[in-house]
């Protein structure tokens, strides 16, 4: 299977939408009209997608469950209209250059962003930005990005989060969350370039390390 043009009229999926390695295309152009699904799964840690280079779903506004993307070749992830993910939102790619979710306001579960499908940082991504993101119900995790230097304003609108974890970020110089008042835990691990930690409104934390 190399294209999904036959699904061009698909607007909603009541249950799960899963893209397995049987699909050998480089993009998801055939799903451009999709507005809502229960969950979206493309690849997994045990079997990452190997051919997709661009994941763009311009009409998708809501995912009622989990949104999971895992691929060795994915360079671009673009959700121009996505406003909420009620479950977990996870992106892992060895080749990630950009991730765009400018309208995303809420993630009900964990938000996990990884610059690798394995244990070593590989993705060349240098910056990411979530300008409207206000709430993450679980853990916010950014891990294994060797070139990600700019995170100062990435989560500037975030008001509520369960916990924060930065791990193996070789060039990240700052950890800044200007609006967070309480957090379960903050863990900053293997971030040798980190110079600035700023949570000016933080009043209570379960742990800080």
Where are these regions (language model features)?
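Concave beta-strand-loop units of leucine-rich repeat
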Residues: 1-30, 36-56, 62-78, 83-98, ...
